[in-house]
Each structure stands twice: as structure tokens, then as C-alpha cells.
């Protein structure tokens, strides 16, 4: 799932989804506003990303995470990503998202990742953003790795459950 302001986070999310599919996972890639938190009960891996704004996640992402709060997420895996400027001062939406996923009981399958963007300005005002070269490909490869790691973790959980029967 993703929130986006200028479209770059959607590009990253869709590249990540291609990687997950290549690894053999069934996926749904959609905007946070098109998903009800209750529908997440059927998902094994919840990947959430958004743009970094004013050092953290956007209001849309924060509201989605807040709505997730009461839903049982135990046994699910999570991954956080964001798009941000290449600056130590830019902050990280992914850091906020990762902490929130962990607080809700998800097992974070891999450390958060950021796709770097450059801003387009008009008269000093940000009017768009572009992904740094190679970020789309990097996130597709990341999707493959996380997809395989998720499959392996789910298989381990299944074997443990079978032994406990």
C-alpha cells in the first residue's frame, strides 16, 4: 500500500510489487485510501510506504496506521518504505511507518528502505519529484528478496504449527 503526492512513491510501490510477484507472492498494490484496515486480515505481508514530508510520514499514512490500531496483526509480516530527498535533514516516513507496524504486532521482515527523489521547483515551490536513477530497479530487486524471505518465513511457521498438532 502506498500514499503518494507526486507519483514517485507509486512508481516505487509498483516496482516492489513486481519483485514480490517474481518471488511467487500474490499481491495487491493500492493506495491507502482504497483499503479498509479490516481487509488486511487476509494478508500475510503488509508493505506500506509514503513520501516523507516535514521529516515524517504524511497525515494520510498516519491516519491509516491509526485506523489499523485495533486490528489483530499478530503473525503478519510488515515492511516500510518511503520516498525522500537525499539529505540527513529530510527525516524518514519509513522510520515512522516501521515503528508503527512493529507497535501493531507485525514482524518487520526487513529493515526500512528509502527511495531517493529530487524535487522539481517553480518559483521556489516544490511542484513535483523525480526518482533518482536506479531506484525503481533497486526496489524491484528488493521485492524479490523480501518476497523470498516472506515465503521462507511462512513455510517455517507452517512447519512449526504442524509439529505442534
For the regions a language model picked out, list residue spans one by one.
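FMN-binding flavodoxin-like domain, especially the glycine-rich phosphate-binding loop
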Residues: 8-11, 15-30, 42-165
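Short acidic active-site motifs
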Residues: 34-39
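Aromatic-flanked redox-active Cys/Sec active sites in thiol-based oxidoreductases
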Residues: 2-6
Amino acid at each position: 500500500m502506498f500514499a503518494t503526492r507526486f507519483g514517485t512513491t507509486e512508481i516505487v510501490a509498483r516496482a516492489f510489487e513486481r519483485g514480490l510477484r517474481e518471488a511467487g507472492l500474490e499481491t495487491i498494490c493500492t493506495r491507502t485510501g482504497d483499503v479498509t484496515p479490516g481487509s488486511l486480515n487476509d494478508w500475510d505481508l503488509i508493505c506500506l510506504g509514503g513520501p516523507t514530508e516535514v521529516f515524517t510520514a504524511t497525515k494520510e499514512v498516519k491516519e491509516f496506521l491509526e485506523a489499523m490500531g485495533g486490528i489483530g496483526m499478530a503473525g503478519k509480516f510488515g515492511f516500510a518504505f518511503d520516498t525522500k530527498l537525499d539529505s540527513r535533514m529530510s527525516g524518514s516516513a519509513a522510520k515512522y511507518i516501521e515503528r508503527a507496524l512493529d507497535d501493531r504486532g507485525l514482524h518487520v521482515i526487513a529493515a526500512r528502505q528509502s527511495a531517493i527523489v529530487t524535487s522539481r521547483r517553480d518559483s521556489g515551490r516544490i511542484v513535483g519529484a523525480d526518482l533518482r536513477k536506479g531506484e525503481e530497479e533497486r526496489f524491484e530487486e528488493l521485492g524479490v528478496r523480501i518476497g523470498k524471505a516472506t515465503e521462507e518465513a511462512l513455510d517455517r511457521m507452517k512447519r512449526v504449527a504442524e509439529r505442534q498438532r
